[in-house]
A protein has these predicted regions:
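"…centered on the first transmembrane helix and the immediately adjacent amphipathic helix/loop
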Residues: 1-67
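Membrane-interfacial alpha-helical segments at the cytosolic side of multi-pass membrane proteins
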Residues: 56-72, 117-132
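Small-polar-interrupted transmembrane alpha-helices in polytopic inner-membrane proteins
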Residues: 13-18, 80-100
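Terminal transmembrane helix and immediately flanking juxtamembrane interfaces
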Residues: 1-22, 110, 119-137
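Short alpha-helical transmembrane interface motifs in multi-pass membrane proteins
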Residues: 47-51, 79-84
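Interfacial helix-loop-helix junctions of multi-pass membrane proteins
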Residues: 93-116
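Membrane-interface helix-boundary motifs at transmembrane edges
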Residues: 1-3, 71-79
C-alpha cells in the first residue's frame, strides 16, 4: 500500500511538472531550453534537441511512474504495460491541447508521438530490467 501511494504521488508530481512547463509562454519556454545551450553550443539545432529530449525524458518518467503505480494492483503485467502506455498517450494529447491555449505555444501531433514513445521506452526498459532479475520497484 505504501508503494502504491508513493508511485501515485510521483505520477501526480510529474503530471504537475508537465502542466507547469506547458503553462509557460513561448518566450519563457525557449529561455528554459536555452539555459542548457552553452553546454551544447557546438551542436547544430541544440535548442530543438534539448526541447525534444526533455519531452522524451519527462514522459518516459511519467510512463515509468504509471507502470509502477499500476503494478501495485492485482492485474497482469501486460495489462499494466498497455494501460500505462494508453495513459501516457492520453496525457500527451491533453498536454498538447493545453499548450494550444498558451501564448506563443502550439499543439503538435509529433510531440504526442514523441511523448508516447518516451513513455513506452521507459516502460519497456523497466520490464526488461525486472525480467533480468532487477528490483520489482
Amino acid at each position: 500500500m505504501k508503494k502504491r501511494i508513493l508511485w501515485i504521488t510521483i505520477s501526480l508530481g510529474i503530471m504537475s511538472l508537465i502542466f507547469y512547463f506547458s503553462s509557460q509562454n513561448g518566450e519563457t519556454s525557449q529561455q528554459t531550453s536555452d539555459f542548457f545551450l552553452p553546454l551544447l553550443q557546438h551542436i547544430p539545432n541544440a535548442s530543438f534537441l534539448i526541447r525534444k529530449t526533455a519531452h522524451f525524458t519527462i514522459f518516459g518518467c511519467l510512463g515509468l511512474s504509471y507502470y509502477q503505480s499500476l503494478s501495485t494492483f492485482p492485474i497482469k503485467k501486460r495489462t499494466c504495460i498497455l494501460l500505462s502506455i494508453i495513459l501516457v498517450f492520453c496525457y500527451a494529447i491533453s498536454d498538447e491541447i493545453h499548450q494550444s491555449f498558451t501564448n506563443g505555444r502550439s499543439c503538435q501531433l509529433s510531440d504526442v508521438f514523441l511523448d508516447t514513445f518516451g513513455g513506452s521506452t521507459y516502460i519497456i526498459l523497466c520490464t526488461l530490467y525486472q525480467k533480468r532479475g532487477g528490483s520489482n520497484s
